[in-house]
Amino acid sequence: MSERNQRKVYQGRVVSDKMDKTITVVVETYKKHTLYGKRVKYSKKFKAHDENNQAKIGDIVKIMETRPLSATKRFRLVEVVEEAVII
């Protein structure tokens, strides 16, 4: 059980849910520039396993690292933190 707690957990926004049982999540983080010290925002996309197809585009979700589920999937959906407002 202690090994499970060391897995990476990210919070990000769903940018694609077109695939069956798979979502694409963009995670934005800040990194300090080594020379100038300014914080620079950068983003990275992860594909995550969504067993019940519950996450939709625009939702804020929490994903956790897991064993490789396919050629590109290394994360699974933990929970939908905030649902998107559809206008």
Swiss-Prot record:
Gene3D superfamilies assigned: Nucleic acid-binding proteins (2.40.50.140)
Chain's gene name: rpsQ
BP GO annotations: translation
Function recorded in the entry: One of the primary rRNA binding proteins, it binds specifically to the 5'-end of 16S ribosomal RNA.
GO molecular function: rRNA binding; structural constituent of ribosome
GO cellular component: cytosolic small ribosomal subunit
Keywords: Ribonucleoprotein, Ribosomal protein, RNA-binding, rRNA-binding
Family statement drawn from the similarity comment of this UniProt entry: Belongs to the universal ribosomal protein uS17 family.
RNA-binding in keyword set: yes
Name of the protein: Small ribosomal subunit protein uS17
Keyword Kinase: no
Lineage of the species this protein comes from: Bacteria, Bacillati, Bacillota, Bacilli, Bacillales
Subunit structure: Part of the 30S ribosomal subunit.
